[in-house]
Amino acid sequence: MSSDLDRQIEQLKRCEIIKESEVRALCSKAREILLEEGNVQRVDSPVTICGDIHGQFYDLKELFKVGGDCPQTNYLFMGDFVDRGFYSVETFLLLLALKVRYPDRITLIRGNHESRQITQVYGFYEECVRKYGSVTVWKYCTEIFDYLSLSALVDGKIFCVHGGLSPSINTLDQIRAIDRKQEVPHEGPMCDLMWSDPEDIPGWNGSPRGAGFLFGEDVVQKFNHDNNLEFICRAHQLVMEGFKYMFNETLVTVWSAPNYCYRCGNVAAILQLDENLKKNFAIFEAAPQESRGAPAKKPAPEYFL
């Protein structure tokens, strides 16, 4: 299997899709591995933590240039692999293939875009249909989304989650008790982990996103104290500098999609933690235009002419 898998990884690294039958086999293997992982997946340092990628495949390649290749570097990706960029299929399948090949060297947690509903609106569904001619690959991938961990805990000290905290979660054990194998709900603790944002407010507030909550410094202090955490690491929000500390460095946002949507002009960052949890933010820019090949924004095939 690993020689097949290595060939598929090489193919995906060239931004070439693999066969539908190979996607099916890959997803089936990934499912077995992800089933064994917890809602709060344990990760050991040293580790490199990454934020949203959003189908920006050539920028993911830049990320690996800066951070090192997997398995030499131990990676944790905090979700939102798909949607908005042109290469969600290649991006997600490459990360999934690396997960199956090196399960202990790459951790993938779920973002709010790892959802059937959201991907039908923001591009992944349409891209799967365009590249494979049917919805089958989208179905295989969205089924895998249901098995992804909800969060990760580095050395018992650093809590990593896509979005943020929830008013219905006080302890990590309450996250461990969630049944995660489902579509992202519209409300409740699982939804909040993927949708919430930190804000300079006291306590909790409704979120303008229409899902999740806004939460303030006091909430973070209490959560970190009660769970013996040093800080919270999350993604979910574009930050122009690639990373942003809040609340006296008890929370950091990491954003890993440079020049987001190919027009925002932001840089991206990854957070490198050494074995003593010393932090280094590596900043990178979007891949140069000439390394990208032609953009894949072909019009959808006109089946009904």
Swiss-Prot record:
Catalytic site: H113
Protein's UniProt keywords contain Zinc: no
Coiled coil: none
Name of the top EC class for this enzyme: hydrolase
Keyword annotations: Cytoplasm, Hydrolase, Manganese, Metal-binding, Nucleus, Protein phosphatase
Protein name: Serine/threonine-protein phosphatase 4 catalytic subunit
Binding-site positions, Mn(2+) 2: D80, N112, H162, H236
Subunit structure: Serine/threonine-protein phosphatase 4 (PP4) occurs in different assemblies of the catalytic and one or more regulatory subunits. Probably part of a PP4 complex containing ppp4c and ppp4r2. Interacts with smkA.
Note accompanying the cofactor annotation: Binds 2 manganese ions per subunit.
Documented EC number(s): 3.1.3.16
PANTHER family noted in UniProt: SERINE/THREONINE-PROTEIN PHOSPHATASE PP2A-RELATED
Family: Belongs to the PPP phosphatase family. PP-4 (PP-X) subfamily.
Cellular component, GO, one term: protein phosphatase 4 complex
Organism: Dictyostelium discoideum
